[in-house]
Each structure stands twice: as structure tokens, then as C-alpha cells.
Amino acid sequence: MKTLLTDLQHSIAQAPEHRHCHMTCEMVYVKRGRARFSIAGVDYTAGPGCLVLISPLEEHSVRALSEPYERYFATLSLPELTRAFPHSALIGVFRNRPAGFCHCVALRGAKPEADAIFDRLCREYAAHLPGARQMAEALLGEMLVLCYRACPGNFAASRSPSAARVDQVQQYIEEHFTQELTVTGLAERFFISPCHLT
């Protein structure tokens, strides 16, 4: 499971505000309290029942606005998410964001469900039981569906075949980012016009 869900914490501890980024996707779910998230130059105030979605290498900072600030913090491997949900638009909130994307989603009436999902994720993460990865995938899928229902505009519309090919290229880049890659080389590898990649 730790290849998909690389870290999961439930916390009420305060942390100093500092700008940072991760090599992984990040989900922060606010259970109680309020915090200000600054992500890619946009400020959001997240209260109880808000889910904050942050992509790899997306610079952000967090400052608690009210106590207790209780939250769940999960980091997720984007390549593993892609493997877990290979044909799903649900992971688009971390990859292919439409214009007007909002990092902070209020789950509104689904807060009790979201609380329960994160409580179960924490138990699965800590217990290392057989089938833990499959359970984590199912719970993450539920959370992303709740997010979709609360804010469908955050998810890209259906993709054309050429856009699907670009998605494959994007996944390849994410998995091979330490290697030297060129647009021309990628276009040849995936039999696609270089203009689709620029």
C-alpha cells in the first residue's frame, strides 16, 4: 500500500508556515478548525469538510486560522494512482485540470462520509492487513467520487483520442522525469505530432 499511499497522518498539532512542494500528490482533509492554504499563488480558506488537492511540485503553504485545526494529510504517488485508476477521469484533479480549477472543495453534506473514509484509511494504513492496498484504492476512489459530486467542474471533460495519447506521454514523463527527454523524442516514441505536445 505504501507505494500508492506514501504517507497518511491524522493531526491536530500545529506546524510552522513555510512554502514547500512535494514530489507526490497531496490531499488534505480538514475535519475541524480552519486553515488558509496558499497554492500556486491563490489563497483558499478551508473549513470542516473541505478537501484540498495539490499536485506534485505545486508550491504551497498552510496556516491554521482557528484551533483545534484537525486534519488528515495524505501523500499519493501519481504513477500508482494512474495504475490504480487507469481509465478514470477522477485522478484528473491531480493531472489535467480545466480552466477555473479550485484546489479547495467543500464536500458539504458528505462530511460524515468523508470523515469515515479518512478514519478507515488511517486504520488500513496503520494495520498492514492483507488486501490493504485494494481497500485503500476503494476508499480513495470513494473520496474522489465525493469530490466529483461536490465540484464536477474540477474534472476535465471527456478526452479525445489525441488527448488520451497526450495523457500517455504525460504519464511517461512523470515516470521518467530524471532522464533527458525531448519533445521530438517523445513524439517519435508515441507516434504523435510534436505540435500536440507543445
Explain the meaning of each model-derived region.
Residues 146, 152, 168, 172-198:
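Basic/polar phosphate-binding segments, predominantly the helix-turn-helix DNA-binding elements
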Residues 36-38, 54, 60-66:
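Short beta-strand His + acidic residue motifs that chelate non-heme Fe in jelly-roll/DSBH
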Residues 1-11, 59-126, 144-153:
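A hydrophobic/aromatic-rich effector-binding and dimerization subdomain
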Residues 6-22:
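Conserved short histidine dyad/triad with adjacent acidic residue
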Residues 41-55:
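Short acidic-glycine-tyrosine-enriched beta hairpin
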Residues 109, 125-142, 160:
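All-alpha amphipathic helical-bundle segments outside canonical DNA-binding/catalytic cores
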Residues 21-37, 53:
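Short, conserved beta-strand element in jelly-roll/cupin
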Residues 110-113, 161-169:
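N-terminal positioning helix adjacent to the helix-turn-helix/winged-helix DNA-binding module
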